[in-house]
Amino acid sequence: ETLIGILMTTVICSTLFLGITQAKLYLEAIRVKEKAFIELKNFTNEWKSMVAAGVSNFPSDSNSGEKVPLKIDSNGNTTLEGNLYKKITKATNSGQYSIYYNIQTYITWDKKNLFFNKEKSLLDTLSFNTYQIQFNIQ
């Protein structure tokens, strides 16, 4: 009886600890996604304002994109990094008097450290697809 009681207690405690660990990892994934959303929103707004101001030549992204820290440890070291990308094209319906651009932005980050994932390349992505008119400021 004692051995069965000890075994049941061990199973229940290990299940409880596994549940607590999964909950912590899930909350951390939500924090990372929230930080990625904020970075992507700021990046998109920056390019929208540049289009609105009249910038018409847009540098192409490098293969790695623009790097931003998504998770920083207590020493200030970056532990998780995201990559921001953009694709800005003149809209097909854009006319002579109303010039507007399609702005596609997205951020990717590696989520292999979350939820005990063993896969080598497991990326998560958030993306925006918006339009911005170019103001004729003279």
Language model features with spans:
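Flexible, low-complexity segments enriched in proline/glycine/serine and punctuated by aromatic residues
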Residues: 7, 21-138
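N-terminal single-pass transmembrane signal-anchor helix
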Residues: 1-19
